Swiss-Prot record:
PANTHER family linked to this entry: UPF0178 PROTEIN YAII
Family to which the UniProt record says this protein belongs: Belongs to the UPF0178 family.
Name of the molecule in the record: UPF0178 protein YqxD
Organism: Bacillus subtilis (strain 168)
Length: 164
């Protein structure tokens, strides 16, 4: 029955939480979420508030504290939700809570690789404290965007029982 969706009475609506302060794939998230009829919640600092945001987009603004968006997301996700973030610390916090966590570049964070990512983040922090700075991430390109959309569709399709 194409186009029909059956929701069990005890099934909670899935939400895509987006760590939105510097997220470059907001449009891709909205488009894909619309196709799968999934709620989206963009979480951002009040420092990034804009009056021009579309009414279709759902935004939650939090204090400008460094970790406020992460804490909001961590406190509001539920099993089955999806989180889009580039924050490795937030990803590590959510992985054991049955939440799919992915980067803006279309990489799925996994429990068996998150420790390595955390070690890399720790090493980079130590280097910065010594005054050694690495280049920042490359600008998001078309392939990154396509990989992101493909992974998000795969997660949502698998959740709907459509296996890839």
């Amino acid at each position: 029955m194409e186009g029909w969706r059956i929701t069990l009475l005890n099934e909670q609506e899935k939400t895509i939480f987006v760590d939105a302060d510097a997220c470059p794939v907001k449009d891709e998230i909205l488009q894909t979420a619309s196709e799968y009829e999934v709620q989206v919640l963009f979480v951002a600092s009040f420092e990034h508030y804009q009056l021009s945001r579309s009414n279709e987009e759902k935004w939650k603004y939090v204090d400008p504290h460094k970790e406020a968006a992460d804490l909001y997301i961590a406190n509001h996700v539920k099993p089955g939700d999806i989180v889009v973030t580039q924050d490795i610390g937030l990803a590590s916090l959510l992985l054991n809570r049955n939440v799919s966590v992915m980067s803006e570049r279309g990489r799925l964070y996994k429990e068996d690789t998150i420790d390595f990512a955390l070690e890399g983040r720790h090493f980079s922090g130590k280097q910065r404290r010594k005054g050694v700075y690495a280049k920042g991430p490359k600008k998001l390109n078309k392939e990154d965007r396509e990989r992101f959309i493909t992974l998000l569709q795969k997660i949502l399709s698998n959740d709907e029982g459509i296996l890839h």
